[in-house]
From Swiss-Prot:
Involved in coproporphyrin-dependent heme b biosynthesis. Catalyzes the decarboxylation of Fe-coproporphyrin III (coproheme) to heme b (protoheme IX), the last step of the pathway. The reaction occurs in a stepwise manner with a three-propionate intermediate. It comes from Bacillus cereus (strain ATCC 14579 / DSM 31 / CCUG 7414 / JCM 2152 / NBRC 15305 / NCIMB 9373 / NCTC 2599 / NRRL B-3711). Its cofactor is Fe-coproporphyrin III. Its EC number is 1.3.98.5. The active site is at Y143. InterPro entries: CHDC, ChdC/CLD, Dimeric_a/b-barrel. GO terms for molecular function: heme binding; metal ion binding; oxidoreductase activity, acting on the CH-CH group of donors, oxygen as acceptor; peroxidase activity. This is Coproheme decarboxylase. NCBIfam families: PRK12276.1 (NF008913).
Amino acid sequence: MSEATTTLDGWYCLHDLRSIDWAAWKTLSSDERGQAVSEFLNVVEKWNEVATAKKGSHAMYTVVGQKADIMLMILRPTMEELNEIETELNKTTLAEYMVPAYSYVSVVELSNYLPADEDPYQNPQILARLYPELPKANHICFYPMDKRRQGDDNWYMLPMEERKKMMYSHSKIGRQYAGKVRQVISGSVGFDDFEWGVTLFADDVLQFKKLIYEMRFDEVSARYGEFGTFFVGNILPDEKVEKFLHI
């Protein structure tokens, strides 16, 4: 049997994507819509306070295309907190005019290839990646993915050293985009329908296409990668939420 990779796990992660029922939203009076927006922003302010205390992080983006209208990415220390956040949001008036479009549950993950005598949880660089402050980049790209398990192309039957070698080659491509694309990898085996979630942040949206296309030619993606639905969007600052929902 092949050896399993040891992972380092950080904050739990929820991607919550929703569509707005614009027709129903229009039936509210201007005052009613204003109250609903204020209530929602009060919830977001609680998230901001958590982020300031460095006990979690979040990101809010509008989604381009018909798959959804808004994407929320929430990071918290426990799965229970993610559930509480989702429930609190569902109890708001605004949620009555939202339709669930997609969700993904995972945990921020790194593969542990450090020497056995080194404690990764004492390494500041690793801690910053396991418990990240999500960037306020202009754009986001999220997609889930699996490693293929078919016939001779079975990632999980490969020896550990071969997997390490291929992942090192794969990661070199990503490092070429340092400063252009920020990446958060989250593991979801046993949590959701795919094995990983990949979230990319960039100020130049074209960098998503360039990075993902270049990685397609690497063996890890070309031979072993299987991908789910892609979602891409634009940042939605708190101060622009009212304008986004204005009728």
